[in-house]
Amino acid sequence: ALAKNAAANGFAAIIAAAGGAAHLAGVIAAQTTLPVIGIPVKSGAMQGVDALYATVQMPPGIPVATVAIDGAKNAAILAAQIIGVANPEVRQKIADFKKKMADDVEKKDAKLQTLGVADYLAQKNK
């Protein structure tokens, strides 16, 4: 019922996380016209590879955008980007978030270049 009524209830996208055979995202995608983002979850002997394959290989007409195993953060960012297509405020927040991530990488790189690998890792692991 959630997937069938999601659009009417104001959803813009659905995120579905599942491990193992990971049917959840496909079942949801078959019941809605909204974008569905699948998160394969690490589990079992295959450590989520089976869930990745199950999530990414949907039949024609049942698209599921798939992120990395345990990739919930990227799933949330992708959902925000989908929402941002029609919402300039959300789009700007995503741009600000990505700028901050890039700035953080630049700061870490500068620190790494100054300290060297061994000291950087020693300081990071304190």
Model-derived regions: residue spans:
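Hydrophobic aliphatic residue packing
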Residues: V27-I28, V36-V41, I62-V67, V105
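C-terminal binding/interaction regions
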Residues: V49-K126
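Short glycine/serine/threonine-rich phosphate/pyrophosphate-binding segments
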Residues: A18-V27, M46-V49, A72-A76
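Glycine-rich phosphate-binding loop
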Residues: L2-P40
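Glycine/small-residue-rich loop that forms an oxyanion/phosphate-binding "nest" at active or ligand-binding sites
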Residues: Q31-V56, P60
